[in-house]
Amino acid sequence: MSARPRPPAGRHPRALRSLATVPGGRRGKWLVLAAWLLIVMALGPLAGKLGEVEDSSANAFLPGKAESAQVNTELEKFRGQDEIIPAVAVYSRDDARTTRADAAKAGADRTALASLVPEGQKIAGPLPSDDGKALMLVVPLTTGSDDFTADLEKVRDVAAADAPSGLDVAVGGPAGSLIDSIEVFGDLDTTLMLATGAVVTVLLLITYRSPVLWLFPALSVGFAAVLTQVVTYLLAKYASLPVDPQSAGILMVLVFGVGTDYALLLIARYREELHRHEDRHEAMRLALRRSGPAVIASAGTIAIGLACLALADINSSRSLGLVGAVGVVCALLAMITVLPALLAVTGRWVFWPFVPRYGTEPRAARTVWARIGGLLQRRPRWSWLMTVGVTAVLALSATGLTMGLTNEEMYQDKPESVVAQEKLSAHYPSGSSDPATVVVRTAARDEVRQAASAVDGVESVRPEDRTADGRLTTLSVVLDDAPDSEAAKKAVDRLRDAVHQVEDADALVGGTTAELLDTRRAAQSDLRTVIPVVLAVVLLVLIALLRSLVAPLLLLATVVLSFFGALGASHLIFTQLLDFPAMDNSLPLMGFVFLVALGIDYNIFLMTRVREEAALHGHTKGVLSGLASTGGVITSAGIVLAATFAVIATMPLVSMAQLGVLVGIGVLLDTFVVRTVLVPSLALDVGARVWWPSRLG
């Protein structure tokens, strides 16, 4: 028997009513748990194989149709799947010319490293710099070697050993950059999963203040993580789902974050129903029916929003969007099946020491959220105008964004390859360590070489290699400027224009500079393509869920405003606190998709409850009751989600750290400003017209 009337069961979709009876049913709960145990036992070992299908090649992070990506594909023809990548050892003195002992050291290193060089290749150097303060060895290595990483480490060990006093030695070049990147990504997904799991556990303990209850959402999220890894592995292996190490790492954070959010919301509603129903199975059945539509709509919005990234040109964006959508769906399945089953098996005692007693009222009406609602009711228009003004001021900071990280700026701590690049830039033509690559028909090689040599910004051009059939040749083009500089990117544009004009050459220009240029342009294009689609999808979901046109438009406007506020606040943190010189090119798009999808998440939870309460008590009381009822749980969910993304901010890659900071700030802004003040005050000011054209009831 209920303490107050609730909407009849018939208001909920029949499929949802049927689903709700299974996980919380007297028999169904055992079937659900048995099914999950079988799935985990049978497929669990596949979760550990996800790393086997991750693609860490350069093309995994490039626009799929970019010219630089085509060059990387063409280069595979030169030695099968093997690629010659040079390691560059730099021996330098800051305030003096190199000595004979320094030259002898570099010469001895050349001899010691000769055994690492693949057949047909040779070590170049020691090459002195024009200022006489540095020497350089270029050691070609092959990615086809089983010991590629060990070979690079040997180069570093040999170069660093027995160096004369005052001689600085660093090994970088493309091989050094590749290995440093691999080391960063090596255990990224495992590290993120363990760190996120620890954060979620601590926050659940604080939220529930129970020695037992936290175990059930944590265990359910663990099931979701295993299922996510298994499904992602199978889709990658058999359906060509693109997965890179970065997306695999963020995937675990997303699953833990949204999975815990859904657990918090379901448990909060279950606790309410336990106050009204003596039978825990009936309480769970009703909790699923009444919270299910919001949770499913939320997960659907996030999953579809992330899936919109499949329209992006940049492969890493497509990867994160698609695997993220898989993770959200798996998290949803776990939270609406295994979690209710676990809670239905155990009963009320898991809430100890705060056990919900049958026949008593929940404390929502006496919480701080009820008092906040009362304050908003007095001056709703002033409240939302003030909130919009403050958020808009934050957003103004986003107008000063500097986009595009250089190679040296990609890491929070400088790896050796970055140090080597800095030394090279100080003493040699800046592009010498990482030249552009031109793939051309051999018959047109000389014409292309002549055209490339005449380009402003090109230091030198020399033939490098040809395919076994002799049809294709590569040219190494050293630029005047550092590979990641704006001047080098402009030179690549001029180089492309020049070589493309050579008839029947089919010339393609790639290399690091070309990759950076192509990625930046694709990121700008992706913004124009993906953002309108995401907004349209989210709007349609809100219209279907709330059966209104006004409310969805208002809610969408609030999350867009929140995104720009978060972007501005993040820019201040990046420049004033963290000393990041620029934002990663992909950050605006990734941040927008995550924050719009996750931000609308909390609006869905709030407004579905407001509509439910408004149908019973009228619009104004419904808004206040909805805020009071959901305030605590949505705040907890927001803190959990922000904390999980904060874990990403501790990663060594600046691009990931920036994503973690932006999403974390955005979620907190949505939680404490948009959902707490802006949306309720707008709903109170607009009144029942917010539900137009539908009627409550």
Mark where each language-model region is.
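Membrane-embedded transmembrane helical bundles of large multi-pass transporters/channels
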Residues: 1-54, 119, 143-403, 513-697
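Short, conserved active-site loops that position catalytic residues or coordinate cofactors/metal ions
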Residues: 51-55, 86-93
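Short hinge/gating elements
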Residues: 56-58, 406-407
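Structured non-transmembrane domains adjacent to transmembrane bundles in polytopic membrane proteins
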Residues: 64-86, 93-178, 402-582, 604
